Structures are given as structure tokens and as C-alpha cells.
């Protein structure tokens, strides 16, 4: 592979679509805390002055949707009307029904291991050894930039920052290896009083320089900081937000393929979410074991059927053992049936709200980020 550029973007927790994702997952967590077997598909829409929470939920739990919604918006930082959105005064509407019994009969089984998939679909997982968290560098650093924006906003370092922000990082590759950063874009909502020059200087010093490794920056690296010149109107006042509209931000920044299913607001019986987590777990353990430098896993399901309809392993020519052997190892060491992967990754806990901003992958405390099977895979593959 010759020289090329690759770009990924991220958005902050205050982006309208991410507000929606976090509300949906906050509702899911509150329900799972009381009822781990609940069936939850929670969708959220946000716009100026209102939040609509809808979907299909079947549970023995009772949760206060309005309180959860307001608390989530408050934690993000929308607490004054001058930001265009206020947790204390926005309307909260609820339109929630129950899961279809036609779906339910295909999922539930007397033997949990025979639990069927909640829907058909295809999911991908990916890992690469180009960063210490075995994630692509462009999405990793795009996330870290907007995480830093939230940090300096909340701790008062840059008090004129507002919650909505976006980042984008373009990396330079030569023969598949990172050689530098070509361009950085960071747009952040801000208070009226800050001027463009002061904002650009502060963002460079407090957000960009502490995050991006200096060895990847050079005289030709281009920086675009609030390139429109003004970003006062933002959040739900600037754009409406919907659950599940940032699926590439949530995953690998475009570096890997995507099956199309969103994550937030879905309980683990929905393989759109749980099987994508399991596929990441498989791919990461293969790379951590040194069996490949890059690995992409595809898995697919039929509704109501436990066994995956297919498993595919792609290593882009970086494999250290034959591809056929890798597929056999995946089938031997990973149970990718819906209930099997729920047990394997211990998914019936309220851990999902935290996933809903700054990426579902590459953050070591999530259970699908464990590399506990790497040595087993290495030994089974016969590598010294």
C-alpha cells in the first residue's frame, strides 16, 4: 500500500444525536438495574425545548422517564436557556409500548443457551495494533479531542465552552504505517463573549496540544478551529438529535465495515448491539494474541435462531497462521450464540450509558475490551 490519508470524526456528549443516545442508554440502565431480563428498545428525539422518548419496553421494572431524561441532560451541561436547551424547563414526552409477542416467542427459550437472536442482521468487529488500545488511530484521537473539550469545559479551565462539539483527524499513512497527522478539525460551541482569536489559541493550547502526539504534528499539519468563525447556536437548538445516528462515530470511524445496526437503547438480546461487542472482543483477542496485525470479524444471525448463520475472519494479509485455522479457533473459543455471548461478556448490567459518548470500543474498562483469551488462542495456534 502506498501513501494515503485516512480521516475519522467524533462528536461530544453535547451533540444532539449523542444527547439522544445517552438518554436512551440511561433509560436502559435504569431498567436493567431492576430487571436484567427486560426487553428494551428505547429511541429518543431531541429538539429545542423538548425531548421525546419512545420505543418498545417489556419489563417488571418501573422507572421515571422524565427524571432520567432531565438528569442526563443536566449532567451533559445544558442547564441554562442561553445555551438553547435547559434540563430544568424542557418538555419531556413519552410514547412507549411493549415488545411484540411475535418477536418474543422467537427469542425466549426454556433452555437459555437456545435463546434466539432478537432479529436478523450482520455485525462487524475490528482490531488493529496501530494503537495501544488496539483501535484505529484516527477515531481514537478524534474521541480524545472531544473528551478533552468536555473535560476543560466542566472543570472550568475554559468556562466559555458549551457542550456541543465535533472533531475530525486526518492521518497520513505510508505502507500501512502512521507517519503523521495531515489535518485537524475542531468545532466547539461557545459563549457569545469569546472572540475567535482567543478561542483558537485556547483550543490549540488546552485541547489539541495535550492530546495529539507531537511526533505526528509538523509544519505542514493543517488546523481548522471553528472554521465558520462562530458557533454560539448549537445543541438541540441548532439541530435535532436522534438515537442511533452516529454509528460510525460509535465504532471504528469508517476504518472497518458496519452492519448498519445502532447500539444505544437496546438490551443485550438485540444482536445489533451484543454481537457487535462480541465481534470486537474476538477481533481484539486475535490481534492481542499476535495472530494478526489487523482483524475484522463478521457474524450474522436469523431471528429466533441461536447459532450464527455465518462467521467470517478477515486479516488483510497480516495473519501469522492460516485464515481457515483462525475461523476454527473463533468457533472453538468463543460462544457467539446470543445467550452465550451475553454470559461471556456479562452484559446484563447497567453499563451502557457510559458507552453512549466517545465510542463503544477502545475503552479498557468495558468487558468486551478484555484480552483474556489471547494466550489461549496463541497456545492453540501453536505460536511460541
UniProtKB/Swiss-Prot annotation:
Catalysis performed (reactions): L-methionine + ATP + H2O = S-adenosyl-L-methionine + phosphate + diphosphate
Cofactor stoichiometry and binding remark: Binds 2 divalent ions per subunit. Binds 1 potassium ion per subunit.
Single GO molecular function: methionine adenosyltransferase activity
Pfam families with a match to the protein in the record: S-AdoMet_synt_C, S-AdoMet_synt_M, S-AdoMet_synt_N
Residues that bind Mg(2+): 17
Keyword field contains Transferase: yes
Record keywords: ATP-binding, Cytoplasm, Magnesium, Metal-binding, Nucleotide-binding, One-carbon metabolism, Potassium, Transferase
Gene Ontology terms: cellular component: cytoplasm
PROSITE patterns, alphabetized: ADOMET_SYNTHASE_1, ADOMET_SYNTHASE_2
Binding-site list for ATP: 15, 164-166, 230-231, 239, 245-246, 262, 266
Pathway where it operates: Amino-acid biosynthesis; S-adenosyl-L-methionine biosynthesis; S-adenosyl-L-methionine from L-methionine: step 1/1
Keyword ATP-binding: yes
Similarity section: Belongs to the AdoMet synthase family.
Function: Catalyzes the formation of S-adenosylmethionine (AdoMet) from methionine and ATP. The overall synthetic reaction is composed of two sequential steps, AdoMet formation and the subsequent tripolyphosphate hydrolysis which occurs prior to release of AdoMet from the enzyme.
Identification of the protein by name: S-adenosylmethionine synthase
Lineage, top ranks: Bacteria, Pseudomonadati, Pseudomonadota, Gammaproteobacteria, Enterobacterales
Gene: metK
